[in-house]
Each structure stands twice: as C-alpha cells, then as structure tokens.
C-alpha cells in the first residue's frame, strides 16, 4: 500500500503490526506504534508520535452511515461512501487507545503541537486547534470545536456541537453541554465557569496589568483591550470574539 511522504523529508518509523489503509498521506518523521489502525482518507503532517492501539479515520458513530472496510479497500473518491476523512497537523503526541473519527460533512481536524492522552477521543467533524491538551479519557462528541491552547482535564465529556474557547481550562470529570468561554476555568456537571485561567494567561506572556485589563472580557463584562496583547494572542482572542454564535 502507498503511504505518500514528502520528498526529502525525514523517514517515518511505522511498526510492522500497524495497519495503514489506502489514502493515508504521511509527512516525514512520524512514529506510528504497534497495532495502530489508520484508514483513509487521512492526511498527517510531520513529526507526530502516534502510540500503540490508536485508531484514526474510522467512520463516525452514525447508525445510517457507511462502514467500509477501509483498511483493505482504497477510497472510492466519493465522500458519501468514504466520509470526509481526517487532517492532522504536525508535532502532535497521540497516546495509546486514542481515537479520531473521520468527518461526515467536513474533515475532522487536529492542529499542531497537541497532546492527546490515553483513551481520549475526537468525534466526527470535530475541530481541535493548536497546543490543545486532552487528558486521559476525554471524550469529544461530533461537531465539537476546541480552540487553541485549551486544556481539558481527565475524564471530561463534551456534548456534540459544544465549543471550548481558547485557553480554557476544564476540570477533570466535567460534563460540558454548552459553550465554555475563553481563558475561563470551568468545572462540574453540568460544567460552569468558576474563574479566570490566570496560569494560562501568564504562560502566554501577559504581565499582571495586562491580565487585569483582560479579565472583564474573560468574564463577559467588558470589551477586549485595544492593546497590550502579544500579536498571536490578540489574533486568537479577536477570532473568538468574532465567532459565529451558532455552528453546525
């Protein structure tokens, strides 16, 4: 089977027991562990560490959806039969028994520099940004959107279609049924905001005065500060502020 690799890139190290179906495109320098199954259409970037017993690209959990034998058969090219696949960026760490389902109307997407711990799950059509941490046994329902730099604690469950804002910290065992605000600390069942993620803001390089200026916006009681934010953070929070209030 063909597993495309960019010309001149570092070699991929794939355990002989791993199963990669047709339509799986790899960048370079990836490690893929024992008994992992990846079925196309899937596109994976560079320098990812994918541990043992990981599944990527299997069909979304839809009773009426197709369940092709994609580890044996090549994709047909028809999304109605193949699904819309998975796109994974670079430098992610995907630990044992994690899973990513393919999309049903768009590709399920994982960004760069994320850490998916043991048993975490990304449902169909989900979008996960960059530098996201999903602790052990975090479950993301279909169509969820986790923005960059969010950190979801062990055993958190996110309902289908819910959104987690950038830099949010969700405490372990939480049940998220609706939107979680940017840079909030949220915990419980049902999950509710309990404070501001000061640690997350300080790790983004903000001094105390800038954190204080941003806090009313985080709490939903003020506007974004006009200046004082690093360019990358400013771009991120402005995008969150301008997000559509409803998603698919």
Predicted regions and their residues:
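Structural signal for interior beta-strand "rungs" in well-ordered beta-sheet cores
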Residues: 7-192
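Interhelical loop and adjacent transmembrane-helix boundary motif
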Residues: 218-221
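Conserved beta-strand-loop-alpha-helix hinge in the C-terminal portion
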Residues: 184-206
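Short, amphipathic C-terminal "tail helix"
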Residues: 227-248
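Short, low-complexity, intrinsically disordered N-terminal peptides in bacterial proteins
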Residues: 1-11, 246-248
